[in-house]
Amino acid sequence: MKPGIKISKRYSARNASVITVLLLLIYLIYINKETIQTKYQGSRINHDSGGDSTKDKTHTFTIKEIHFRPLDEKTQSYGSLQVTPEFVNMAKSEFEQNVAVASGDNEDLYDKQLWSASIKSNPWTHQFTLKQGSIKMKRMVNRDPDYVESFLDYAHENPEMARKVHLDWVDESVLAPNVTDKETVISLALMSSNAYVRLPYEGDWRNLSDWNNDLNPDLSVGIGWDSDGVRGHIFSNDDSSVIVIALKGTSAQGLPGSGEDETTDNDKLNDNVLFSCCCARVSYLWKTACDCYVKSYTCDEKCLEQELVRKDRYYQAVLDIYRSVVTAHPNSAIWITGHSLGGALASLLGRTFGAPAVAFEAPGELLATKRLHLPMPPGLPAYQEGVWHIGHTADPIFMGTCNGASSSCSIAGYAMETSCHSGKVCVYDVVTDKGWHVNMLNHRIHTVIDGILTDYDTVAKCKTPDACHDCFNWNYVKGRDVPKKHKSSSSTASSTSAETSTLTVGPSPPEKTTTSCIGRNWIGICTEYGI
């Protein structure tokens, strides 16, 4: 027999064996496809999905960590503080001491401490009860912070191209707080209130920054506490299967009941960038919060978008807080809450990563959502929203009526010009039901808890907000080059003729002198002029 024929038969036998093995593998994969698919989906999606078996389960939460992300990371490190028994005793003693000092005026105490007068327990030892539910949500398949933030960076550099990027979306059942349960809503509001409570300056802060202090020996860098930063209080249930992030809201001297601390100036700056039409350019009397104003009712849109994502702005800070929490709890369901500015940031953060978020008395954040180019699934139905805005009709900040030169917000230096919310709104009509008057004092978190949430027998019904459009009278341009309006040929000719006759008849008119105001009193009247 020829050698070539032996080789051919040997290869044929080997090929037949390989084909047999492949067919066997394909058969095994086919009969076990459901098991393989389940394991694959479990590895690529966070373990916050739940079915009917987990519905209406009640959890008890306590505060576990405090995160503080500074705005200037060159002089301060991002740190976290573990809430240990030693810290609780120290914080509890300080809070009780403040209560004793202010025992003659409890209302003033709670204005400063931002803790409900109806809750007798200490904010550092209180146990929060939340009932979970299962909701249908449409969100991105890949919600890893690295992937999401890289997409956002690309969207800000190339917004037109980013709209053409095909993102993978998934419909799934997600664990979420049951906002139809009264005790759950009150507990979330108390968590938001807890984020305002002043911290003792002492504590064993842990460095979460990515840089090594040994490489920067000339920098006097502290960890955890600074005058400029964002604070997030982290709550966990017994088995850490559910984590709640409560973001601190606005502290301001001009907003009663919002507390006063070191973050006041930056809180106002971020409020004015997030919730104004253009850098808080309310009138010529105002100093703008950024340099995007072009001329009357004209604003540089690209400049505004870049302002929102600066590293020293609050949105970037809460992205870092979320990243740290998810890294520490990769298999936990993450819920987010907050009051006022903290509520708006909670909504933006929940929208970014597809996490359930409950906001209390937040200003309208739909405009900021669009400017940040947050991922929005096409044709998202209202029932698949995971963002809830809880508020009442006597709060002008939540209702979007705290604007205008004579408003309380404007007098305090806040340009709250937005009124449109994303997600769903749950509104208590206290003006009709209780006869309340619209007043900025009603924006206080403990007023909401004590006067509304605990007083009503049922929670407000959540619904999709009506169609809304903020800043409709503003013109937004891409870049500083504003297109000039072209005049007709007849008007141009008449203008040229007028200029020629002016130059040939008699002496030229005297030059006009312009004056500018270089000093104003506290109500805006000019008291000193300069040439």
Swiss-Prot record:
Glycosylation sites: 178, 207
UniProt topology in membrane: Single-pass type II membrane protein
GO MF entry, a single one: triacylglycerol lipase activity
Membrane-crossing residue ranges in chain numbering: 12-31
Record topology, Lumenal segments: 32-531
Catalytic-site annotation from UniProt: 340
Superkingdom field: Eukaryota
SUPFAM superfamilies recorded: alpha/beta-Hydrolases (SSF53474)
Catalytic activity entry: a triacylglycerol + H2O = a diacylglycerol + a fatty acid + H(+)
EC number: 3.1.1.3
Protein location: Endosome, Multivesicular body membrane; Prevacuolar compartment membrane
Residue numbers on the Cytoplasmic membrane side: 1-11
Low complexity bias locations: 489-502
UniProtKB keywords: Autophagy, Endosome, Glycoprotein, Hydrolase, Lipid degradation, Lipid metabolism, Membrane, Signal-anchor, Transmembrane, Transmembrane helix
Disordered, as annotated region: 482-513
GO biological process: multivesicular body membrane disassembly; neutral lipid catabolic process; phosphatidylserine catabolic process; piecemeal microautophagy of the nucleus
GO CC entries: multivesicular body membrane; vacuolar lumen
Function statement: Lipase which is essential for lysis of subvacuolar cytoplasm to vacuole targeted bodies and intravacuolar autophagic bodies. Involved in the lysis of intravacuolar multivesicular body (MVB) vesicles. The intravacuolar membrane disintegration by ATG15 is critical to life span extension.
Family (UniProt): Belongs to the AB hydrolase superfamily. Lipase family.
Subunit architecture: Binds to both phosphatidylinositol (PI) and phosphatidylinositol 3,5-bisphosphate (PIP2).
PANTHER family (UniProt xref): LIPASE ATG15-RELATED
Name of this chain's protein: Putative lipase ATG15
